[in-house]
Amino acid sequence: MNIKYNKALWLIIILAIVMMIPFLGLSDFNTKGEPREAVVAYTMLEHGNWILPINNGGDIPYKPPFFHWCIAFFSLIAGHVNEYTSRLPSAVSLVLMTIGGFVFYAKRKNTQTSLIAAILTLTAFEVHRAGMNCRVDMVNSALMVGAMYLLYRWWEKGKHQLPWLAILCMSGATLTKGPVGIILPCFVMGVFMLTQRENFWGIVWRMA
């Protein structure tokens, strides 16, 4: 069982990396949204304003800064902002979300089920496209999915302590795309707990 699990895990890791990472810089920005996000990271690096940078002389970003921080981090390593470094946060998020899904289901079902789930995630058209784009959606989705996995683990263990890792993921999602990063994972977990006949007000208290 362990050998099969380890082989499947390495297969998913290698497959996810090979499918995503080498191809990020092969095409120019092809939507108005991609350069709009990249220029925010460029402005952060150029002017040192990491909270509310001013773009093109007067425009301010209308999305929270976490995604742009990620672009700026990778671009700082590379030396400049380009298509590859701008798309890398999305690709890394998809790789980590795929691996996280595999590990989550392997512990609760079996290796075969988790392998199928991971491959379906990685090859789903919209998910793959989001992972190849310089947009906030993939980073936001990966953090929310991670939060839901961690909230489920917290429920499994009896809800004794605060789910700090889930809170950290939801904080990152909120810093990526706003309050939906908290609202959606808590709503999904709240509905799940209701299906398990948990006390309604107890759920509200724990999710608040």
Each predicted region: which residue ranges?
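Membrane-integral, polyisoprenol-dependent glycosyltransferases
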Residues: 1-208
